[in-house]
């Protein structure tokens, strides 16, 4: 089971963050067909937005989420961005969370810091434990 799916642009910030995070993850391709997932996952995405907030969600992420199966298995989103862009910092996470009715679990800047990595690891462990407990309760 891959519990993380991510997209990283040519800047590589999200890819560097994911490498340092050290957890199994599926990378979305920039141009090839989108994969289809078969288990619940958390999406990690950068933010691409103009000064007005348009275009915040990268096109490969939109393409991936337009697959109803992929969208149904999404459990949360982690978003990256650049604080220099003010209100649009990590906006992709807010857009996806609202459209897909999932929580924004974390926001990070650029390639993240060591503190971000530690918080994400701990937060994801708690999140998946809670998801597992919820699944067990609904199956009982």
From Swiss-Prot:
A Gene Ontology molecular function term of the record: FMN binding
SUPFAM superfamilies found in the cross-reference section: Flavoproteins (SSF52218)
One Pfam family this sequence matches: Flavodoxin_NdrI
Biological processes per GO annotation: protein modification process
InterPro entries for this protein: Flavoprotein-like_sf, RNR_Ib_NrdI_bac, RNR_NrdI
Function: Probably involved in ribonucleotide reductase function.
Family of this protein: Belongs to the NrdI family.
Name of the protein: Protein NrdI
Species per Swiss-Prot/TrEMBL record: Ruegeria sp. (strain TM1040) (Silicibacter sp.)
Lineage: Bacteria, Pseudomonadati, Pseudomonadota, Alphaproteobacteria, Rhodobacterales
């Amino acid at each position: 089971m891959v519990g993380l799916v991510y997209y990283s642009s040519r800047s590589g910030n999200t890819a560097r963050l994911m490498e340092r995070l050290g957890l199994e993850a599926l990378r979305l391709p920039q141009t090839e067909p989108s994969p289809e997932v078969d288990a619940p996952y958390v999406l990690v995405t950068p933010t691409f937005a103009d000064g007005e907030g348009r275009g915040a969600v990268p096109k490969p992420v939109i393409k991936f989420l337009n697959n109803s199966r992929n969208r149904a298995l999404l459990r949360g989103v982690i978003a990256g961005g650049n604080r220099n862009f003010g209100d649009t910092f990590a906006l992709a996470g807010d857009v996806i969370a609202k459209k897909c009715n999932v929580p924004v679990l974390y926001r990070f800047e650029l390639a993240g810091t060591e503190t971000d990595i530690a918080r994400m690891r701990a937060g994801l462990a708690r999140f998946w434990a809670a998801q597992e407990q919820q699944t067990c309760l609904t199956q009982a």
